[in-house]
């Protein structure tokens, strides 16, 4: 129920009627003059995808009832992301995170589609971003926040989804203050179609700070999302890394 259709005069393109299906799935127009018309779905029922394929109908004699049928596909919304990285690191070493399965798995387009990496700022400093590539041609941008500025700023813009970039994201490249560092960055695509997904895998390179204590651990969180019909569709992935702790020598007990 509640699927809406608009009926247009075929020749003039004028809207002549708007109809809505009842509980039985049937919608009936008011009596229309003889002629040719185009029926277009304008609003799908809840949990179903919109199909704007026009249906041509013709009323050839007075009182004629013209029947048409349309089947909508059930709507499915889902996004995904998976993040992995090193299990164990040493203070001061470089750390790489790998991303897989970044996708809009929905049967419909999503707006404001993004994926984001929230860095464990107490443990790492962002160095480089390998962007990866995606299966649909388009442009996107990368924005970031820092410990001194909670507003998003543009890191790189007008990037192509079909080109793989290695981007310098170090504090010096971005002109950050001496005590400023990136706490999160977001890759923002805008509108993406259903089945939009990564091809080459994105990777993020960070430097582990030198003052971490052996035996501690830190968590990096990535998330992905997009909007359908005013609702956010989201997913999250986390990865835990330990800081290596050298084995303490056993006390000598003999000679």
Predicted regions and their residues:
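Solvent-exposed loop/turn and edge beta-strand elements of beta-rich ligand-binding domains
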Residues: 1-255
């Amino acid at each position: 129920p509640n699927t809406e259709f608009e009926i247009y005069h075929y020749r003039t393109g004028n809207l002549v009627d708007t109809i809505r299906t009842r509980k039985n799935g049937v919608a009936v127009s008011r009596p229309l003059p003889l002629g040719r018309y185009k029926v277009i779905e304008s609003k799908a029922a809840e949990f179903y995808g919109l199909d704007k394929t026009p249906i041509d109908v013709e009323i050839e004699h007075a009182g004629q009832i013209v029947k048409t049928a349309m089947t909508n596909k059930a709507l499915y919304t889902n996004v995904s992301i998976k993040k992995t990285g090193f299990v164990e690191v040493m203070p001061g070493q470089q750390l790489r995170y790998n991303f897989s399965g970044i996708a809009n798995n929905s049967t419909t387009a999503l707006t404001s589609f993004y994926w984001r990496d929230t860095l464990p700022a107490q443990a790492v400093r962002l160095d480089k971003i390998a962007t990866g590539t995606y299966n649909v041609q388009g442009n996107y941008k990368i924005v970031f926040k820092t410990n001194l500025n909670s507003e998003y700023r543009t890191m790189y813009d007008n990037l192509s989804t079909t080109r793989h970039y290695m981007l310098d994201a170090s504090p010096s490249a971005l002109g950050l203050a001496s005590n400023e560092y990136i706490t999160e960055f977001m890759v923002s695509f805008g509108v993406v179609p259903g089945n939009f997904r990564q091809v080459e895998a994105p990777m993020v390179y960070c430097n582990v700070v030198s003052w971490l204590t052996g035996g501690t651990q830190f968590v990096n969180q990535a998330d992905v999302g997009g909007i359908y019909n005013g609702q956010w569709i989201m997913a999250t992935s986390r990865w835990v890394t330990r800081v290596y702790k050298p084995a303490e020598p056993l006390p000598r007990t003999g000679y």
